[in-house]
């Protein structure tokens, strides 16, 4: 009985729902008859009634299809896959490590250009950087990596720099091997209107070092994203960043700025057409112009005249130098020249380029230097940058300068960074870590063959919270035969060995006569080692295996110092381990008449060189001197038997970007020639001084700029020459010098 009631109740409910459904449909049809309205086909987008009040920025069909005149993501992916068939390449699958495990090590070979080959200015600079690097080889059998002689920088078919038939030509290379162990440099790919990443030839298994690289097509751990740079970008050296001249206050006159082209149609126009929305003419200046290209007047809109007029009111360089943040939107391609300009100016880049694989993203932590925005959230950018604190602003700006100086200021640095990244992948067991790449002085100046431990370098003591060791090794450069126990070198040995910080003494014997027996040397409380210098002046800076301490005291055989002077200089060096600390100063200057650099030993109010005849420095600079500097500079030093100390100062100043440190008041640090017999000391020869003038100009030419920095301060001991008891002074002997 109860079951029957349940079924009856269920049936009644079902009937009610059916009647309600039909009643609702009847009401809708009656309303249509009364209002004379017909049923409409459902639309995916609303049909606004107030169309006159809403300007059409895009057609409704474009919105339904995803917007933009370019191909769909699927079409772009298919086009990429058809050209780059090895899209899954990784170092383990598409690179022959066996070519790099030979005795030659990591060597790079450049294919010789064919007769009459057209090479653009930018690609010529790249080839020059490779050929002048320490990795270049002219023998392809020694090569680990290959670089094409064919210009592949500009693959826009409408460009005058476009080189046709690349695919056929590279397949004719006997060493091409489907691109394995090759690196291809490219700045521009694709052409109007879609600017796809089509290079016009199959790169195969080659590593692609490309600007404006899309994350969809980037092969992680294999390809390398490089910055877009102009043909005017300097070959080497390059200008320093501008933060040193404009560091305080952290916030500048303008909060955010952009000044550039506005694309009226085509890819990249969506973002740049919307930039005027954030312009307020006060602390945010966003200026665009339609006046570019041949047909801009055909496509100009109602806003062009006003934008062009506003565009002329502001100077780009003034905005760049006086803005805290710089907007870096995408152009036709993902990369932009604005990126490097912002880095140099210490104007924090605010990126609006969705899908852009940032330059050298494998090793650079870009969140420490840029603000990444979203093209779809342009209106949120002002509030985002306003929320960045002052301490964060200063940190970001400082990091822009670190990255600019280390990797982007010249074509040389861009190319060498590319090669060093590949080298780290090949020799991963001795590769650099992220701190080495992102902290001063940068990865190019940290050679992992020296050590993989941060504590072994002079740059990371503050990062690690430690101090250098309490011992040093003295290296004495000897060029005169030992004929008397009263020679200056005998006195010097006694003075140095009395220092409680001296671990050992190494005599680098560069005399024509063979070194004397051990019994001829005076007894000392520290180990004494005599090493053959092979009669090469540059050998005093070779990385001798016997040097185990971090600090090296470099001395000439005729140097005159007190033990207390050595101890004080060593204490000062422990506070400046990345610089040269010592006694004899020299200086450089620019001669406007000769239009060349000059060198002077006069006592002036400033100095830029500390001679290594009496100076402390870190032993890592021996490794840099031998493995970073080109052999041509070391050969120049050996040929002239001169300038090795100037070259070491150039090297250390280029690494530290700081001047050396002069200690105490001593000016004369050598025995006078009359006390050494009839033979005149080399430094007393006028020809010796002339050679040093020439060396300064030769070295600055190789570095591409003048790395030496002037300083006007000297460090003396506390209580130096104060009217207090000598018993309270630790270095009282320094006052009698």
From Swiss-Prot:
Requisite cofactors: Mn(2+)
Q: Report membrane topology.
A: Single-pass type II membrane protein
Q: Give the UniProt subcellular location, in the record's own words.
A: Endoplasmic reticulum membrane
An example GO BP is: protein glycosylation
Query: What intrachain disulfides are recorded?
Result: 643-695
Transmembrane parts of this sequence? 7-27
| Segments on the Cytoplasmic side according to the record's topology features | 1-6
Q: Glycosylated at which positions?
A: 194, 322
UniProt GO molecular function: acetylglucosaminyltransferase activity; glucuronosyl-N-acetylglucosaminyl-proteoglycan 4-alpha-N-acetylglucosaminyltransferase activity; glucuronosyltransferase activity; metal ion binding; N-acetylglucosaminyl-proteoglycan 4-beta-glucuronosyltransferase activity
- Chain residues that bind Mn(2+): 558
GO annotation, cellular component aspect: endoplasmic reticulum membrane; Golgi apparatus
E.C. code: 2.4.1.224, 2.4.1.225
**Entry function:** Glycosyltransferase required for the biosynthesis of heparan-sulfate.
Q: Which family does it belong to?
A: Belongs to the glycosyltransferase 47 family.
The name this protein goes by in its record? Exostosin-1c
Q: Which organism is it from?
A: Danio rerio (Zebrafish)
